[in-house]
Amino acid sequence: MKLSTTINFFTYEDDGSYSAYYYDLEHYAKLGFSHLDSIFCSADAPFSPLWTNHYEDWAHKIRKKADELGITFVQTHVPFYNFCDLKKGVNENTEEIVRRSIVCTNILGAHWTVSHPGTA
């Protein structure tokens, strides 16, 4: 069994600025965690790197830092919404962020991603 904990890369300050995920990775490594579950559920927030054309570079930087610290990503959680709600329908922007989250999952080296469709 691999003991792991969860890291949310998309934590924002009250002013909308983005928290430094490097510090979180270092913090978990110092606590002795070498396996992480990554949360992408807030990846559609306004300042998310997933809204940029450089989101893959961002994921590669995280992977590099994690590798330096001996951390592996076990799984991720992609953003979700209730696409079954006939009043809301499919949200193309959220669908793109889900797709980008899956691309980042691959870059991070996680073999699984979790989604909760229809439960939001």
Model-assigned labels for residue ranges:
Residues 1-111:
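N-terminal pre-domain/capping segments
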Residues 116-120:
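Active-site-proximal loop/short-helix segments
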